[in-house]
Every structure is written in C-alpha cells, then in structure tokens.
Amino acid sequence: MALRASWKGFLTVGALSCHVGLYAAASTSERISLHMVNRKTGHRLRRQYVDEETGEPVEADAQVKGYEVSKGEFVTVEPDEIADIVPAGTKTIAVNTFLACTDVDTAYFDRPYFLAPVDEPSAEVLKLLAAGMSERKVAALGEAVLFRRVRRLLIRPVAEGGALTACTLNFDYEVRSAQEQFADVPKTRISGEMLELATHIIRSKPGKFDPSAIEDRYEDALAALVRAKMEGKPLPKPEPRREEKVVSLLDALRASAGSPDKPAPKRAGAKGKAAGTKTAGSKAGSAKAGGSKATGTKTRKAKSAAASAGAQTRRTGTTRKAG
C-alpha cells in the first residue's frame, strides 16, 4: 500500500524546481497496541479532562491552552492567537547549502522521511539531483515551514535507486551539550596491555549494519503472551537471568580477547587468527540474521493469530471473560 504524504510542496535548488512529498520513513503502527480496560466490565476506558480543583469535567469549548508563570497561575493562549504567529508557509523546501554527509552531528537528527516526486517530470529532476549528490558525496541543507515551525532538513541520496531521503533536524537549543554531560568523567590515559587487548577485540569483530538482525524481543514476547491468553494456553515462562560475576576491567578484556593469562598478539602476528575469527563471526552473524527473520515471521504469525482469535472471540462474546 502506497504511503500517505505527510507534506507536499516544491523542492527548489537554484533554478531547479520539482513537486515533491515527504513520506514518513519510520512508523510504530505495526507494534502491538494495548488499551486501558475496565477490569470488571471489560469495557474500554476513555480519558476525560477534569478541573484540577473542582474535579468537574470540562467541556471542549471551555478548554484552552495556557503557560504556567507560577504555581497554579497561567497565561491563556487562544487558538487564533497561536495561528497568527505561525510562520507564513510557501510550501517550498529551499536548498541553499551542500555539505559533506558527515558534517552534521547525529544528535541533531529528528525524523526521517522519503523525499519522493509526485509526478513524472519531477521524478527526472529528483533523479538528476540525487545522481549529482551521490557523485560529489554530499548532502543538501534545506529549509521549509513544516508543522507550524521553520525546520531545517538534511537531504541525502539513497545508496541505490537514485532517490533522496530527508531528515528534519533538531534545533540547537534542543540538543544537549556533550561537554556538560561528560564534564565529570575523569581524564585518564589508556595504554599498555589494556589498549592492546581493546584494539585486538575491535579488529576481531568486523561487520556491517544489518537492521534485520536486530530483534525486538519485547514485541515478540508480548505477541506470544497475547496469543497464549487468547488461545487459553499456559503463559510463556520468562527466561531466568544469569548472575554476572564482577571482574576487573583487565580480566574482562582478557576474557573477551580469548587470552585470560597473557596480552593479545601484535597486529602483524594476529592476521591468521583474526581472519579465522572473522569467518566464525560471519557464520554466527548469518545464523543470527536467519534467526531474526524467523523470529519476525513468528511475530507476524502471532499477530495474525491474535487478530483471528480476537475476531472469533468477539463473535462468541468471550473477550471480557478472559480479562
């Protein structure tokens, strides 16, 4: 099913212009959703705004936003007052700068979108732009009024396909200072055996990012739990947690490097061993990826089974009895 555009407008780069849409590249809609339910009746609960002091429900026409200036004291802001301060939008993403893809700290990344054409003439312009950016290995910095605010977007070419992605960027005041966060971390110099072991471990575990190998174990467990309850089967038992022994940093490095009693070999002498480790790691990675896909399939089957069981339960009227 084709995605629905979150925004439509024009992308302009100098004299070039094309009609584009922003389509959300990530979504949580496939996750299992749980609702609040009355335990006694089985009916779904609904939220209601009540006055903090009187406890009385407040009708929609009496509700207004407010900024708290002191404890219990608010300055109210009317909807039309907010509408008046929204920047005038031109429905245009204006690109004014090209820069290296690595120039923007990932802490500024907000939400990812697919930047796609909405007609055939625009598709040709976008492909041309994507090809040029890929050739130069650069990203574009654009600006547009999105969802009431003037937002900056980092536009990057997709590795394959001649397409573009756009990521809204956090404002500078929203990104916390790394210097402040790490100000209390003691400055120490790491050298000798500890550094050799650390670099050996890093060299022995090369790989590539594979999103399919990342398992959402909570989602899988939740699907299994819901399915078991709907089918009246025993609930799955949690796996016992292993108690980790507290060891020194050096001992932990030695154990990770597979050398508990002596330092890791020098880089030149470790080629054969590293190569062997890489092969084993590749097999393990393949097995893990395969297991992940199987797990994902089981999750989808669990959701499908849950949906089917839910429909059957609603027909027989046993949902509320199950709790």
Curated annotation (Swiss-Prot):
Database matches in InterPro entries: Ku70/Ku80_beta-barrel_dom, Prok_Ku, SPOC-like_C_dom_sf
Region described as Disordered: spans on this chain: 255-323
Start-end of Low complexity biased regions: 271-297, 304-323
Pfam families: Ku
GO molecular function ontology, one term from the record: double-stranded DNA binding
Any single GO BP term: DNA recombination
SMART domains with a match to the protein in the record: Ku78
HAMAP family: Prokaryotic_Ku
Main function: With LigD forms a non-homologous end joining (NHEJ) DNA repair enzyme, which repairs dsDNA breaks with reduced fidelity. Binds linear dsDNA with 5'- and 3'- overhangs but not closed circular dsDNA nor ssDNA. Recruits and stimulates the ligase activity of LigD.
Subunit structure and binding partners: Homodimer. Interacts with LigD.
Family: Belongs to the prokaryotic Ku family.
Protein name (database record): Non-homologous end joining protein Ku
Organism: Azorhizobium caulinodans (strain ATCC 43989 / DSM 5975 / JCM 20966 / LMG 6465 / NBRC 14845 / NCIMB 13405 / ORS 571)
Gene: ku
